[in-house]
Amino acid sequence: MNKTLYYIFIITITGVFSITSIQAAEVTLEKVWETDAIYKLPESVIYDKKRDILYVSNINEDGFKHLGNGFISKVSTDGKVVDMKWVLGLDAPKGLTISNDKLYATDINSLIEIDIKTGKILNRYVAPAAIHLNDVAADDKGQIYAADTLTDSIYRLNSIGLFAMWLNDTALEAPNGLHVEGNDMIIGSWGFPTDGFNTEIPGHLKIVSLIDKSIKSLGNAKPVGNLDGVEADGNGAYYVTDWINGKLLHIQPNGDSTLLLNLSSGAADLEVILEKKLIIIPLMKDNKLVAYKIR
């Protein structure tokens, strides 16, 4: 496979998608692998450092229907399938996170707890009022948070096994991607949907305090896209995917953004493995995974 170098320069786009950069340095991403179209609506990928393996959620057919044909794949970090249908019996799994040697997956209105050692489902925590549980993240206490994009809500599985609504506020602006840093949760907002998943004003990054649930925008609150995955870059900024427009963005603490990659629509919940300098992105509509080296 030929390797493609992507050189990212400072750009400014005017209008509602305001994308600028505070960085003067050139950023280089090298495409290192891309799978064939072998997945079934892959939504999220997460890295298990302990086992040096990736897990990929496959919605399979319909993200809103309880069809029972969703699954989770096990994949090597060089893009090779280890077990395509490692976990079965899911409906439409989306966000993934790992805590205390368990894998958690959102599944429409449920949070699924999986024993990583065996691949067996341990628990299904149901939130009857939830519509579209999306990304999921764990705090340092082992509590699990899940975004319900269409109800402007965050659910939490606490330390005693209670899964309930933790926060409901329109200021979340359709929360999608979640990333926990200490006592803060970084949220990739989709923006207020006006017709299905379309928006007049796209979303930006939000910060929610895990202490007092206060909500604020990251930096200047410029609309940047219909945000999906959010991961830290290790230097105070974030790699973020725009699902609708198929973009990889680099968002600074002041809210300014650099366009890193033009991908295809459906760029979903990415994983960033800092120690390997690797970014892995599910291309949901293309049924592929693609990986880039940070140079």
PLM feature spans:
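A short loop-to-beta-strand structural motif that recurs across blades of beta-propeller domains
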Residues: 70-73, 110-112, 153-155, 204-206, ...
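Flexible "stalk/tail and boundary" regions
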Residues: 74-77, 99-101, 156-162, 179-183, ...
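A short beta-strand motif characteristic of beta-propeller blades
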Residues: 30-35, 80-86, 120-126, 162-168, ...
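Asp-box/WD-like beta-propeller blade repeats and closely related beta-sheet repeat scaffolds
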Residues: 29, 110-111, 116-141, 147
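Short loop/turn segments that connect beta-strands within beta-propeller blades
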Residues: 75-79, 115-120, 158-162, 209-213, ...
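Beta-rich, blade/repeat-based domains predominating
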Residues: 38-51, 57, 62, 67-69, ...
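Bacterial N-terminal signal peptides
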Residues: 8-18
